[in-house]
């Protein structure tokens, strides 16, 4: 062994209003088997029938403004005809940027992305606090005052490190089984409990004469940038809310990994004519595991792990690491496992049969 340390394809501008059959309406040419939108039309009731397939990997969508994270997942499931998909951390509808979406077996690695750091670039409009802490809400407090750049910079250390943060009223935090935003929409004002979050870095990038300031922040899991703007405004005595927000980094993914929805649509159109594959848009499942060691095993040991059996680690080739590792065989991802007490114990086994990121062809698992 060696150690190597929704039913419609929605366009961004009409996400709230698109009809259920818009995605297929513009395709006139016959579709071949490369087209993930290919539907079997010969159902007994005469209605189109869509076959779902196994797709494994990550797509880092450059989410457009106006689309919810749930809608984005539905769009990609539709586009790939994927059986299973989920996102690795909600991004507000009014925000743009990186929304990592896990397909198939990649959903087993979602916690590794959600626990990673996130980086945002955001703009705060001073002089007004809103109930949603962004431009969508109604004003609840106003001030004619505007902060100076010096006052803002002097405040930033108070919002760096581990701080106590009260989530926005309009947030996905659960209160006795209900989402805070549902209660807020019903007119209920429920006190939210402060909770610790970690902000690794907070920088003032620009400070304009228009009453707005641009920041960059790198923070940990559970941080609300809207709450950050709200709290800075209160301490500066001028109030504030988010008027622009973009996520630029999520765990191992940055802007170079992001793909716009229009580009995915174009790739799908090319696949329909046999000129490409949606596999080109996928990142490997193990991309989410960059921060943990990789352990290569023999095919014999791989067969045991695949059956859920532990493997003894001994001899000079035994790994020197402990804890969680991801296991490969012949360069192919096999499992998440724990190293301890001289054993390699499988925790999550991957079955990568179907469309994967490694090539434009389908591969079989061991």
Curated annotation (Swiss-Prot):
Which class of enzymes does this protein belong to? isomerase
The protein's Enzyme Commission number = 5.4.99.25
InterPro entries the UniProt entry points to:
PsdUridine_synth_cat_dom_sf, PsdUridine_synth_N, tRNA_psdUridine_synth_TruB, TruB_C
Q: Where is the active site?
A: 92 (nucleophile)
The UniProt annotation puts the region (Disordered) at 1-55
- Point out the coiled-coil segments of this chain: none
A Gene Ontology biological process in which this protein takes part is: tRNA pseudouridine synthesis
GO molecular function terms here? RNA binding; tRNA pseudouridine(55) synthase activity
Keywords noted in UniProt: Isomerase, tRNA processing
What Gene3D superfamilies does the record point to? Pseudouridine synthase
Q: Which reaction does it catalyse?
A: uridine(55) in tRNA = pseudouridine(55) in tRNA
Q: What does this protein do?
A: Responsible for synthesis of pseudouridine from uracil-55 in the psi GC loop of transfer RNAs.
Q: Which family does it belong to?
A: Belongs to the pseudouridine synthase TruB family. Type 1 subfamily.
User: What protein am I looking at?
Assistant: tRNA pseudouridine synthase B
Q: Give the organism the record lists.
A: Rhodopseudomonas palustris (strain ATCC BAA-98 / CGA009)
